Each structure stands twice: as C-alpha cells, then as structure tokens.
Amino acid sequence: MSLTGLPDIRKKIGQFHHLRIYKQILSLQGNFARLNYFLGDVFPANLRSASVSVFFEVRLGPRIPDCIVLLKSVDAKDEFAFHCYFFEFKTTLGKSTMQSVHHNCIHQAQYLQGLRQLQQSISFLDQYLIADEVSWNVVPVICFFRQWGLKLDFFKKFSGKTKRLSFSFIRDLFARSQDGAVQSLLSIPNYTNFRRACQKHTDLYRKRCRKAPKSVLTKTSGENRSRASRQVAKNAPKNRIRRTAKKDAKRQ
C-alpha cells in the first residue's frame, strides 16, 4: 500500500503531530538525558557533554528528513569529532511494533518510505566529502510515535556511516535549508498559540456550524414547543385529567 492513497485529513493530522514532536525536541534540547529518552536513548553516554544543534525539515536534494541532530563530541577518546543523527518520524493512531511493521500495511508503508527518505538524505552528503576533514558518524533513525500523548512506541537505529565533512559548511547547509514556515511556527513561545498556528498551517480548522436562517429557527422553535406541550399532555395521569374536567363542569 502507498501512503498517497490515505485521505488528506489523515495526512494533515500527521503533519500536525510532527510539529508537536519538533516543539518537544526544541524544549528538551538543553537537557541531554531527557532529549535522549524522548528519542529512544539513541545517543551514546559519552556524548552527554556534547554541544547539540537541531534542524527540522532540511531540504537535501529531493528529500526532506524530519529532523537532524548534530552533536559535537568533546570526548578525547572518541574516534568521531561529530555525530550526526538523521531522524524520520512516523505517527500512528494505534500502537506500533516491529510486528505491526511487518503485518500492518500502513505501518509497513510508513517504515519503507522512512527508510528511503533516510538513505537518500544521507547519500546526498557524499558530494561534500573532503578527504582531509574530520570524521563524522552519520546515523539514520526511524521513530514511530503514537499521536495520543506523543508516546514513542517503536524505533530502529541503523548502523552509522563514516564521512569526512566540513563542520562549518554542513552546519550552514542544514541551517539555511530548513523550512522557513516550520521555523516560524516553532518560534511561537505560547503553546496554545503554537497549537492554533499549527492547526492553521496544516489546514486543520475547527469549523463552526453555520447559523440557520431566522425563519427556520423560529419555525423550529415553535414546532418544538408544540411537540413538548403535546408530550406533557400525553404523559399526564388520566385520573388527574378527569378530576380537572369535573371541577370545570361544577363551576359552569
């Protein structure tokens, strides 16, 4: 099954939850332990003191990975000067597992699409290889989040690839190739305003019901009152109706 066959509303909901994931990552950027936990503990412990840079929806040729986390190692024993993690996020209504990826056609399509995205995004960097530059460890990761509560259900971390790249050039490439609209949304500090802006960005409006014409409303209200009166009379006890009728007859 191809994801292009999904209803547009499902795609828009997925985009909305992607923005929520990005916002959460930004809020945890300064806390290595919490950020690592949120993403499945994919970062090794020796990077605890590394400086962290985060980029979202970076256009790399034909592909746009969801998130790139760049860590500058300060460990003298580390064979890599930089660790670059490419993340592809998938959101699901129900729980996702390795088994569901094999048997659920939608999860499987999401997984395969994510793999292609990661593979082609990382391969794009090959044109910038420089023989005498420092070594990078470039690692692809795919994460499945449940939409309710943004719970990480399942992730897969693949083997890293060693590349020799210029830090200043690649960092600037990532920074200037980010989606400008997404950056503007993520800069909104208030969460309520951020959520509303995300709904607008993804076209997920809470549409209000249109008001009916006054004539229709008046007629409907009158009909409802008449129906209510008939219902009360119908439900009234018969003996009470009879006593009331006798009293009226005596008065006459």
UniProtKB/Swiss-Prot annotation:
Induction: Expressed late in the infection cycle. Keywords: Host cytoplasm, Host Golgi apparatus, Host nucleus, Late protein, Virion. It comes from the Viruses. GO terms for cellular component: host cell Golgi apparatus; host cell nucleolus; virion component. Pfam families: Herpes_UL24. Its main location: virion. It is found in: Virion; Host cytoplasm; Host nucleus, Host nucleolus; Host Golgi apparatus. May participate in nuclear egress of viral particles. Plays a role in the dispersal of several host nucleolar proteins including NCL/nucleolin and NPM1. Since deletion of host NCL/nucleolin negatively impact on nuclear egress, UL24 supposedly acts on this process through its effect on host nucleoli. This is Protein UL24 homolog. It comes from Human herpesvirus 6A (strain Uganda-1102) (HHV-6 variant A).
